[in-house]
């Protein structure tokens, strides 16, 4: 809806705020679920009742627009060909990021002396970092117009290199900082670029594709990364992080190869 109601110059800031709220919501939901789980494991699922509160907000504040697909917008294949740089970028971004939550806790427990609660705090801190980055994302887009497209894959690579090379606490903290920055930049950036490229038709053309790519990446990440790590690093628990580095490089190459599409319009 942001692409429908707001001009391109406002969208980067608003997309960043949306991403920040997404991260903060994850932190809040995780904390509430943790408290409920202490009462009983099945009570943790009550966190989904927050959806009722969200439903009230939707009914009260979201506009009652009917967004029909514009004539000549094409179907699924046409839109995929048109916006594949952003769609592929979102898929790779989610594959890179979800290697972290699906492996970090298990690897830390086996390779460090950290308490499970400390590991949880570190993981929550990553979401906080991503939220803070989302808040300032609009300014970053204006300041680094030409290079911001490379930030997410580079910070993913740096973060996973920290994990892969050392299990020490400082290395883990720095790695989480880098990955939080990468996630805080990557999602709003890809949404913003696609939204600007599609204009007011974004809600019915590229945004559904980005949403599908986002969830596909989350689903595919462990299915793809874990078997590869098991094959190439069968006796190395940190091997999964080297696979994450490889996917980060692939993400960086994709950003470079599609750099013309992923560029912001020139300043007026």
Predicted regions and their residues:
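A late C-terminal transmembrane helix in Major Facilitator Superfamily
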Residues: 197-234
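Juxtamembrane intracellular "pre-TM" segments in multi-pass secondary transporters
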Residues: 62-87
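C-terminal transmembrane helical hairpin of 12-TM major facilitator-type secondary transporters
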Residues: 145-190
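Intracellular juxtamembrane helix-capping segments at the cytosolic ends
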Residues: 1-6, 185-199
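Extracytoplasmic gate region of multi-pass secondary transporters
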Residues: 83-124
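Cytoplasmic helix-loop-helix junction between adjacent transmembrane helices
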Residues: 1-22
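Helix-to-loop junctions at the C-terminal end of transmembrane segments
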Residues: 133-145, 229
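Symmetry-related core transmembrane helices of the 12-TM Major Facilitator Superfamily/SLC fold
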Residues: 45-60, 239-256
């Amino acid at each position: 809806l942001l692409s429908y109601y707001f001009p391109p110059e406002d969208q980067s800031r608003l997309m960043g705020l949306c991403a920040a709220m997404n991260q903060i919501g994850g932190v809040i939901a995780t904390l509430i679920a943790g408290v409920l789980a202490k009462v009983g494991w099945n009570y943790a699922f009550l966190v989904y009742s927050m959806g009722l509160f969200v439903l009230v907000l939707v009914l009260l504040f979201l506009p009652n627009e009917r967004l029909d697909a514009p004539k000549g917008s094409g179907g699924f294949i046409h839109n995929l060909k048109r916006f594949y740089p952003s769609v592929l970028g979102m898929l790779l971004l989610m594959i890179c990021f979800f290697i972290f939550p699906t492996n970090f806790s298990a690897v830390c427990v086996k390779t460090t002396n950290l308490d499970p609660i400390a590991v949880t705090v570190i993981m929550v801190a990553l979401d906080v970092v991503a939220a803070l980055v989302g808040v300032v994302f609009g300014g970053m887009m204006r300041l680094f117009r030409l290079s911001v497209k490379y930030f997410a894959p580079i910070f993913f690579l740096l973060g996973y290199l920290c994990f892969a090379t050392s299990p020490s606490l400082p290395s883990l903290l720095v790695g989480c900082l880098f990955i939080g920055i990468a996630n805080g930049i990557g999602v709003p950036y890809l949404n913003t670029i696609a939204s600007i490229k599609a204009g007011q038709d974004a809600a019915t053309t590229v945004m559904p594709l980005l949403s599908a790519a986002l969830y596909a990446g989350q689903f595919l990440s462990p299915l793809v990364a874990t078997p590869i790590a098991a094959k190439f690093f069968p006796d190395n628990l940190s091997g999964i992080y080297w696979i994450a580095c490889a996917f980060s490089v692939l993400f960086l190459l994709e950003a470079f190869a599609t750099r013309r599409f992923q560029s912001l319009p020139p300043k007026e």
